[in-house]
Amino acid sequence: MIEADRLIQPQVIEPDEVVDRAMRPKLLDEYTGQDDTRAQLKIFIEAAQKRGEALDHMLIYGPPGLGKTTLAMIVANEMGVNIKSTSGPVLEKAGDLAALLTNLEENDVLFIDEIHRLSPVVEEILYPAMEDYQLDIMIGEGPAARSIKLDLPPFTLVGATTQAGSLTSPLRARFGIPLRLEFYNIKDLSTIVIRSAKVMELEIDEEGAIEIARRSRGTPRIANRLLRRVRDFAEVKHSGAVTKVVAELALDMLDVDAEGFDYMDRKLLLAIIDKFMGGPVGLDNLAAAIGEERETIEDVLEPFLIQQGFVQRTPRGRIATQRAYNHFNLIQPEAK
């Protein structure tokens, strides 16, 4: 299992949660990156406001740490409504969902993180709520049980998931606005780093921000986490200001290399190169070779490596690319 304190893991690390909340943008104009998504949202929100209606139900999907929760909160702020947040695993019974739905006010936002992990019984309750703003619930047990319908105010369900393919077709079809978040480019990430540094009252120059962004795996959550660790280094070892040199020294010490890789990324790449002669290697064999679960490889390690061109996924298995060999100053063997 990957250690919970892996510095560049995109999932939330508990001690960082409060600080991350303070750094989050509140409105679309403050939100950096995801230009197409922002442009679409502006139109959808303005149209809903002109009609005086709830925004259509929205599914936000993509790798972890890219701002799905932040976008849900921005939608509520832009619409001028309340937001209630929960997650799929928490909603164990139909009554858990019913309690949330019956406390919504008109046009409110209900945010369900990890919506792909909803139980089937809860998902069934959600269908009429999304389509007709009605709640069908069973009262009582056994022969005396009866179904009652409750009218709900119009509301917007915002679902977030890292595994859109795991959603059932009926649930996925009920979202009128699907939004995919992509990894951020270095320019946008450096802008986020500079904004976060201002919130932290930290002096940072542009080159320092770019260096942190370059090693942040295209992920704002990782960029903010690295910024906090670089700040610690700058305050103890230097004058307190973050420059390119300070950022390089700090991140090298933290074992985050120039590509944003840590030991787990290098372990995976070297396993493909050394143990499987560059591949192809099946997912189960690769998982066994590095001592990780296949889900961890698919959901946490692989997406960035594939997106950056270090690993190629083929029908026969994973292959290390020329770029992976170059990263370790190795010569790629001739194709088999």
UniProtKB/Swiss-Prot annotation:
Residues 258-336 are annotated as: Head domain (RuvB-H). Keywords: ATP-binding, Cytoplasm, DNA damage, DNA recombination, DNA repair, DNA-binding, Hydrolase, Nucleotide-binding. It is an enzyme of class 3 (hydrolase). Mg(2+) binds at T69. It is found in: Cytoplasm. InterPro entries: AAA+_ATPase (IPR003593), AAA_lid_4 (IPR041445), DNA_helicase_Holl-junc_RuvB (IPR004605), P-loop_NTPase (IPR027417), RuvB-like_N (IPR008824), RuvB_C (IPR008823), WH-like_DNA-bd_sf (IPR036388), WH_DNA-bd_sf (IPR036390). It holds the Pfam family AAA_lid_4. Residues 4-184 are annotated as: Large ATPase domain (RuvB-L). One of its GO terms (cellular component) is Holliday junction resolvase complex. SMART domains: AAA (SM00382). ATP binds at R24, G65, K68, T69, T70, E131, D132, Y133, R174, Y184, R221. Its EC number is 3.6.4.-. SUPFAM superfamilies: P-loop containing nucleoside triphosphate hydrolases, Winged helix' DNA-binding domain. Homohexamer. Forms an RuvA(8)-RuvB(12)-Holliday junction (HJ) complex. HJ DNA is sandwiched between 2 RuvA tetramers; dsDNA enters through RuvA and exits via RuvB. An RuvB hexamer assembles on each DNA strand where it exits the tetramer. Each RuvB hexamer is contacted by two RuvA subunits (via domain III) on 2 adjacent RuvB subunits; this complex drives branch migration. In the full resolvosome a probable DNA-RuvA(4)-RuvB(12)-RuvC(2) complex forms which resolves the HJ. This is Holliday junction branch migration complex subunit RuvB.
